[in-house]
Amino acid sequence: MIPRDVKSPTVAIPFHKLLKIVAIIDRGNSQAQELVSQIVDQGFEVELRGDYSADVSEDADVGAYIGSVEGGQLSAARSFLRAVRDIGFRTPIWAMADTLTIKDMDVVEMAGEVDGFVYLGQQTPTFYAKQIVSSAVNYGKSLLPPFFGGMMAYDGEANIAFDCPGHQGGQFYRKSPAGQLFFKYFGESIFRNDLCNADVDLGDLLIHEGPAVEAQKQAARIFGADRTYFILNGTSTSNKVVANAVLRSGDLVLFDRNNHKSLHQGALVQAGAIPIYLPTARNSFGMIGAVDWAAWEESWLRRKIEEHPLVSDKNRAKADRPFRLACIQLATYDGTIYNVSQVMEKIGHLCDYVLWDEAWIGYNAFHPLFEGHSPMRLKDLGADMPGLFSTQSVHKQGAGFSQASQIHKRDEHISGQRRFVEHKRFNESLLMHVSTSPFYPLFASLDVNAKVHEGKAGEMLWDRCIELGIEVRKKLRGFVKHYETKGANPEEQWFFDPFVPDKISVSCSKHSSDLAETRWEDIPTDVLKREQQCWRFGPEAKWHGYAGYAPGYTMVDPNKLTLLTPGIDRETGEYREFGIPATVVANYLREQRVVPEKCDLNSLLFLLTPAEDESKLNTLVAKLVKFKNLWDRDAPLQEVLPTVFAANRERYAGYTVRQVCREMHSFYRDAGVKDLQRLCFRSESFPEPAIAPKQAYEALVANNVDYVPLVEAAGRISATLALIYPPGIGVIVPGERWDERARPMRDYFLAFEESFNRFPGFNYEVQGVFQERIDGRIKFYTYVVREQGDGRISS
């Protein structure tokens, strides 16, 4: 089907229902009131304000401003105008005057930024109203990105549907009582815009035509890519699309051991590539760190290829570019962000392509704090550099519906080379993975996400978010200091500590004079939100607990609010005598209707986006203080966690919150769980790759496997990707042997098996390892590949 050209709507979009007009006027001025009446008669809501004091960041739904500059208000009007433009809004602004003349107007500060002047009495209110309404409508049109705008226009045409989906505008639902509830809850628009590709007005989402491809082109321009592809089933699919477009069976892939399971599945199981694993850091709080800096060394990487048992041709280690693809988590779940420029200097010449998995970021292209940390903003990419992919989970911290993802492709600098993957071949991989029945509102959310980041607006949105994150960390640091001095004993001298430096030094900054050993919370917010040195993981610093870094190599993400719970000494990384496992606090917060993103051993993660405001963050702080008060009086567990207690009444009868934390902390300490977790991602613990991951998965499909208790898996080949979720990072990979090197991995899972039995109600999700209840206890089982007596795989 050939789509029609992108067209203007045949039915006017009802901007009068979507935007309002704000009038900052003297309510006693009859001519001004007549102007307002004329605008209201044209269907627009008009909000009257008496002055210019409102926070313009809350005015995203304003279609035009009318502002009086009489009566000494000219200076305030100028400040207001600057505030609107500074946050990136291009909202029409009309200056309303009566006695001021042309010579009174400041051409530089005023006339250059306003859309027009209203002189009451010179033209009729009806005429001025038409001008203002017209400017609001035109502004509304300018806000509509290609696909979303086309979808609104299509909806306005009220086409009669005899195609998919079967609910046909929601009318099927309205035929039944349950369906009526469903229809009314979501509202008619979502159903009317759940469209079918049988009508080509909106273009083809799979072969990229019409408004669909225009939306993706606009996103590419805004994010800095050569091409962008919208993906509607998550970054798990985006990663598989890239992996299967680039990799063949037997290709070498440089593989971050922190990679999400989707890259194991796409690159290793589906494509059949051979991984060269990169060791990664964990700190004692259970947080995910970066690849060891030393692991990027070319000599180390070539040696690993030579030593790999699945690489039969050892000369591959000598190839100019031995790696077809590198797969790297640009930002870890816990907020470690790589300096992309530094990593590219180390491995760029060794790889045909680099895939940067940006599932947990995506805003790094829009704020100067992240300079050097965005692959789409790298400069001077030459023909000797690798092609770049970024995969982004727009739904995680962007403005996208759940499962909204996108792939950015930046490789025109290698166009014409044999390693180049042109669009047509790339799209064949995309077609293998995406649905032929896309959900149009989901696609539109990706279109709008790009639009809201266009121009200055993207930076301003994230600037405010970063600022709020800084302020809440400063507030929390104040509580830390308070309780350290006011607590009656060590078990009360604590509070939830934000994961930022205690003290920092800054030198040669464009944003600050030199600082020496200054408390982080004492540094001005305007400096903190601009200066990378305030967020870097210094190699020698103790506060972060990571090892193996280089100067400037990584920084902490300001939009990941991570709070540490007691139990670990930040200076030494060793267990303390008492502790509060983060899972207890996470369960408490959920009881209080505050939902954290995740928890690990002794850390809580809260995602920050431009959606945040003071009310949410102050409520979070209040709930944390409430938990501290419950802790200090050692409240009954039934009061702190009523749901967990009710489900496990017999187990926790008579328990207080301190008692359950004491037992759980002692268990984790005695089992050495933090050290087991760290070892799972170190080179010395990587098991023997007995067979390729793809071969192990084929054994699982063919049922050439045994289902055994994990304690009996020693020496056997794993047939599954085993992991704890979150964060969904593979601990042992299909094809790896549960050998002696893998003992930390086995002991890590067995520690969780025991914790599930000891502490019901505080379980984590496990995948690739399965929970069976035997004789009243949970026991972990897993699938292992069936081998013949001579070590060959059964067929």
What are these regions (language model features)?
Residues P177-Q270, I276:
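Long, structured ligand/cofactor-binding scaffold of large enzymes
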Residues G28-L35, L74, L100-D106, S262-L263:
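Short, charged/polar "capping" segments at the starts of alpha-helices
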Residues E47-Y52, S57, R78-R90, M105-V107, ...:
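Conserved PLP-enzyme active-site core in the AAT-like
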Residues A60-I66, V114-V118, D226, D251, ...:
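Conserved acidic residues
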Residues P9-S30, L35-V40, F44-L48, L268:
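Conserved acidic segment of CheY-like receiver
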Residues L19-V22, T228, V253, A326:
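Conserved hydrophobic helix-helix packing surfaces used for dimerization/oligomerization
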Residues I2-L19, V40-G43, S53-Y65, S75-R78, ...:
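Non-catalytic terminal extensions of PLP-dependent enzymes
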Residues A23-S30, G50-D51, I66-G71, M96-L100, ...:
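Structural motif
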